[in-house]
Amino acid sequence: CCCSVPKSPTLTFFGAAGEVTGSCTLLETDSARVLVDFGLFQGAPSQEQRNTVPPALDFRRLSAVVCTHAHIDHCGRLGMLPRLGYEGLVHCTEPTATLLPMVLRSSANLQKVRIDEFRNGTGPDAVVLDPAPDPAIAAAAERFEDPPVLYSRGDAERVGRSVVGAPYLAWREIAPGVRMRLHDAGHIIGSASVELEIKHGAQRIRVLFSGDIGPT
C-alpha cells in the first residue's frame, strides 16, 4: 500500500501513576507532543529527590504544555522548563494564568530558603536535601546546584511570561492537529479538566485529563 497509516496517539505517564503527586503526562501524535502538568513530587525525602531527575523526554521537541491548576503537585516543576530547553507556551485557564507566576516565584524563593538552611545547618530541610544515594539522582542534581535547586526566581519569571490563559469551554488550537477545551473541575479557583481533540487521519480522537476534581 502506498498510503502510510497515521500512528495512534500515545500517553506516557511520568508521575501521579501509582502515586498522588508529581502529575506529568505526555501526549504524542504524528504531528505534536503535548505535556499535561509538570508537578512536584512531595512527601518523604526520597520522593522529593525525584524532582531533580527530569522525565526522559526531549523538552525541546514539545509542541505545548498545559497546566490543569496551580497546586504545586501539578505545576511545581514548570519553572524547570527554561533549563530543560522548552521555549513554548504554557496553556491554562485565565485564573490559573494569574496564579501560576506567583506560585512559581514563591516556590523559587522557598528553594532559596531551603538551600540557606542546608548550608547553615538549620531547619529540617538540611536533612531533606541531603544528596541522594542513587547515583542517577545525584548526577542529575549536579546539573543544577549542589544541593539541588530546581529553578531560580528568574526561571520562574521567564515561565510566567509564557503562560497563556483560555476561557472555559472554548476550543483553542494549541499544537498541530490538537485542540484544547477546558472544563471547570471545581477544585480550586481556575482548576480545569483538560479535553484534547486530536486529528488522526479522517478521525478525531478526544482525551480528557480530569485533573483534581472537587473541593478536596
List PLM regions with ranges.
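Cysteine-centered motifs
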Residues: 1-3
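Catalytic core of the metallo-beta-lactamase
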Residues: 7-10, 14, 26-29, 169-216
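Residue-level detector of functional hotspots within protein domains
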Residues: 10-13, 51, 56, 76, ...
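Hydrophobic/aromatic beta-strand patches that form the interior of the parallel beta-sheet core
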Residues: 12, 34, 66, 91, ...
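Pre-active-site segment of Zn-dependent metallo-hydrolases
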Residues: 17-22, 29-88, 92-162, 213-216
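Eukaryotic helix-linker segments that join adjacent hydrophobic helices
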Residues: 159-167, 172
